[in-house]
């Protein structure tokens, strides 16, 4: 075993203030995930089946970010969700897996003028991920940005960079309803993961911090650690635009929120993300996520406004 190193997550640090002449209204939150994909805000909605379908993707895109349509859908259903977003002339992404059958999904997605394809797995430093990346690169348009993940080390970053992806997604187990670190004992605290992955990136490849964002200040910390954008799940879940019905319980309103490694999500199709697709007996799934109720929050635009407002407040103190 390698020597144990100290590792940090967002809660372990704060950012030191700097001399600044910048006002919040003067701050630019624009970012590029590739030469083809520019965002007005550095926010992506997570490819989770209780977070992003067309309604969420449309709302996030209108605010300047991009939503990634989850893959716990049939190919036809996912294409339908993508078309709803593209019909509004908005940017949208779509998640794909690594199973051999997933390439058929990819072939249909690339016909939709998709802006972003995300190879969405729990372990991006693997041969299956490499295989699907090489296949996607052969058929995708130059206009489509290719992202792969998730990883947490510089070695994994070098691996994906050599394969020619545009963006790398970082995060092994930081999500609020992900239990990978408990079940498998695997993971790297998110801030340290970002700093390490950054060492393995070449200058052209961008980085997304995926998971662990609980406050707007965490976005600022992720960007300070080298991320070009963040992917958010729990903070956007429970909003009007998130999939699922509103549930009333003891006079309060809720929506269902679950990890893609939960039993419910794996039963719907995400078992492939955790390399358990070949397990025919669903009772033998080893879940790496949980499911529960999350407070209903209303329109997602209000949440995004608070997140970007907090980011601007941080940048006014840090930007010279």
Predicted stretch roles:
Residues 1-206, 234-239:
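Active-site entrance/lid segments in N-terminal catalytic domains of soluble metabolic enzymes
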Residues 1-21, 95, 163, 185-209, ...:
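Alpha/beta catalytic cores of nucleotide-metabolism and tRNA/nucleoside-modifying enzymes
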């Amino acid at each position: 075993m390698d020597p144990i190193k100290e590792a940090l997550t967002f809660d372990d640090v704060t950012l030191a203030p700097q001399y600044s002449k910048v006002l919040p209204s003067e701050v630019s939150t624009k970012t590029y995930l590739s030469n083809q994909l520019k965002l007005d805000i550095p926010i992506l909605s997570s490819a989770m089946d209780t977070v992003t379908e067309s309604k969420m993707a449309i709302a996030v895109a209108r605010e300047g970010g991009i939503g990634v349509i989850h893959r716990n859908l049939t190919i036809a259903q996912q294409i339908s969700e993508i078309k709803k977003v593209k019909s509004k002339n908005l940017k949208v992404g779509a998640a794909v897996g690594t199973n051999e059958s997933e390439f058929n999904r990819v072939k249909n997605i690339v016909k939709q003028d998709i802006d972003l394809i995300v190879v969405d797995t729990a372990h991006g430093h693997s041969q299956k991920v490499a295989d699907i990346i090489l296949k996607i690169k052969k058929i995708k348009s130059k206009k489509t940005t290719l992202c792969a993940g998730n990883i947490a080390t510089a070695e994994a970053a070098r691996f994906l960079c050599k394969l020619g992806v545009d963006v790398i997604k970082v995060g092994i187990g930081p999500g609020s309803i992900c239990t990978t670190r408990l079940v498998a004992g695997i993971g790297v605290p998110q801030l340290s993961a970002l700093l390490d992955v950054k060492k393995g990136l070449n200058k052209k490849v961008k980085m997304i911090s995926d998971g662990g964002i609980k406050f707007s200040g965490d976005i600022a910390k992720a960007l300070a650690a080298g991320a070009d954008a963040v992917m958010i799940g729990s903070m956007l879940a429970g909003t009007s635009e998130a999939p699922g019905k509103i549930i009333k319980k003891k006079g309060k309103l809720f929506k269902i929120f679950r990890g893609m490694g939960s039993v419910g999500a794996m039963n719907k199709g995400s078992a492939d993300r955790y390399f358990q697709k070949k397990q025919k007996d669903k009772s033998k799934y080893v879940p790496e996520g949980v499911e529960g109720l999350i407070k209903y929050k209303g329109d997602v635009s209000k949440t995004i406004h608070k997140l970007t407002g907090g980011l601007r407040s941080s940048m006014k103190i840090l930007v010279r």
